[in-house]
Structures are given as C-alpha cells and as structure tokens.
Amino acid sequence: MEKENLQAFLAENAIKPASIAYAASKRFRGEDGQPIEWKISPISNDENKAIADRNRKKSFVPGTRETQINFDQEQYANDIICACVVYPNLNSAELQSSYGAVGAGELVRLMLTPGEYQDLFQAVMQANNFDVGMDEKIKVAKN
C-alpha cells in the first residue's frame, strides 16, 4: 500500500477559490454595448458562519418557556450577496445615492429585478461551491 501523502492538503498547496465574472443584468451596458460583468469573490467558512449567525434569531414560543431559533433566509441571501460582490462596489456612496439606497443590501435590491436578484444569488452560491451535489462528489471520488 502506498504511503499517504499529505502534501496536497497543506494550506500553501491548496488551490485558492477563484473569483467569477457574472453579468447580473443586461440593463447595465458598457461603452461597447455589452452587459457589464459583476465580479463575485467567494468568502471563507468563518465569514459565512458570521453571516448565518447574524440571521438567526432566538424567540420564545408563546405560552411556553421554550425558545425557538428562526433563520431569516431572505436576509441571509442579501448579506451573502453583499459580502461576495466586489464589483460594482455596493458600498459606494455615489452608487447608493443614485438609487436613493441606504446600505449595500438595499442598493442591490433596487438595482436588480427580482429575477436578476435570484440569478445573482445563484451565481454567488456557485462561486462558493454550494452548487456541487453529493452525487457528483461521490462520482468524482469513485473515479
């Protein structure tokens, strides 16, 4: 049996996740008339956990002493989009002022149609490797 080699698993040898370019809307066009691509960068597990934790709220069950945890999926989606989109700069005061938005979260919702927003969320999930199903991972491991 071949000795296990852990070199590929060392941090310095791991391939860093790449940013992706994604045209979130056909309505934003460059000088060449082509849709402008947004730049989406993946986040770390720690950043994702912090975003998820911000969107968990503990509340009391009425009439009992029990608590339940509620997860705000819509706000999580908005927060992860804002964390991953690096271009355009959603924190730009000029851009927010143009749309009358206060904050990156409100800005991205105002900039995009509901369908574009949902597609952008899917692109953000893909950039963070949430799109690979378990069946596909098992097939890769078997081969």
What are these regions (language model features)?
Residues 32-143:
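Short, surface-exposed, charged amphipathic helix/loop patches that serve as local interaction elements
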Residues 1-16, 137-143:
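Low-complexity intrinsically disordered segments
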Residues 1-2, 16-19, 61-65:
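A short linear-motif detector with a strong N-terminal bias
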Residues 11-29:
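Short acidic, Pro/Gly- and aromatic-enriched capping/linker segments at domain boundaries
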